[in-house]
Amino acid sequence: MSCTSEMPPLNGETAVVSSVATSISIPSTSENPTSVPPPMVPSTTQVNDDQLVVPVGMCDFMTEGSMGFGNRSPNKPDSVVVIGKSDGNLAIIAEHWGQTLGPQVLVVGQIHGDECAPAFVVDELRERPPENYGLWLIPTLNPDGHFLGSRTNGSGIDLNRDGLTQSAPETKALMAFTRLVAPDLTVYLHSPLNWIGYFNGSLAQKVGSQLVSALGMDVLYTSGSNPPETAFLWQGQNAVVPGQQSILIEMPSISTKEAPAAPNRSRDSFSTVEKVSVFASIVRDTLDEAMKELE
């Protein structure tokens, strides 16, 4: 059984956006975002096939059994779109899996480039794609940080403190994509604090409570708000599309090398690759069960 509490001190979580809405077209058949098919045509921006692959980074080699954010599964997404470019001109991609109609969930796999445990959830979602809802998966919002093994993007911006100014191209891309697909729920993945938070609505609170129960935790936190000048990603997303609901999943880390530059390491939770893999599997299964109720 879980109770709701204010968010504990954060290691950090944010995002950034580029004006990309004009580069992806979406057929609108209803005013209800849930019933609108997601974009199934690629961005009109010309990209090479190699830009649709997440670059190898620190997370690929952190420890035995660790992995990066590239697709290791034999499964292929329904579509892949480029939602923008990073500060270092790397493509930021979004993969669509599962249903094209009905509930749509947006999962942001990595925001800080030195947080590697979220790759296990990304891998789990690809290995066992959803059957009863649509999934938009952004493997990493911060390909520069992933490549460099840094918390920030190529210009030193912490994307999860960019919710107000939305100055980074990565944040701009995410916000434009949020406007475009209007997800029913957004899931942000982080490490290494090992807790669950929710923001802005009954669906998010319900899914958060189910995750807390399934993971054997005691408390569901509210994700909280930073002062406007350092607004979190979910605050920026809510400003772009009012009423957007989100879940923050802070995973335990797979290594003490993970998130070395985090603002506050006093609450770090260290685990093993095996246990983080189980955590990721539970996240995938809980999302699947929760979204069945929205069909």
Regions found by a protein language model. Give the residues of each.
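Bacterial signal peptide processing site
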Residues: T4-M7
